[in-house]
């Protein structure tokens, strides 16, 4: 996993690896499609001048944390992608990706749950 990615690079990586269209990424990051498109269309040199968490992207931070934990738990991308769409008892029988899309608080819940599981593993 790349360690020196910025928030926008992580969001793009999530979109590609999880095979999400712009609307799906918008739903699980809780960032408007127009905002995502604005930042994704920036040139690399323009991105360098942005703050660590660019305006309007604060709700996407738990998604990056979720992604990082899932990559640690499931090095196999196919298993990771399967985990996202299979009903899970940790989330009251809901699919994790659907829980993430419910609200920023639900996204944080998924992120927190995965972080807790990661800490429990040796």
Segments predicted by a language model, with ranges:
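Non-transmembrane "mature" sequence context
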Residues: 1-122
């Amino acid at each position: 996993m790349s360690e020196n990615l910025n928030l926008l690079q992580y969001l793009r990586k999530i979109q590609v690896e999880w095979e999400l269209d712009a609307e799906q990424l918008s739903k699980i990051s809780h960032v408007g499609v127009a905002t995502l498109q604005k930042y994704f269309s920036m040139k690399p040199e323009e991105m360098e001048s942005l703050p660590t968490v660019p305006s309007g992207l604060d709700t996407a931070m738990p998604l990056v944390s979720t992604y990082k934990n899932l990559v640690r738990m499931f090095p196999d991308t196919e298993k990771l992608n399967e985990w996202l769409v299979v009903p899970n008892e940790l989330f009251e029988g809901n699919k994790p990706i659907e829980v993430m899309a419910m609200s920023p608080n639900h996204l944080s819940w998924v992120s927190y749950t995965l972080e807790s599981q990661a800490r429990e593993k040796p």
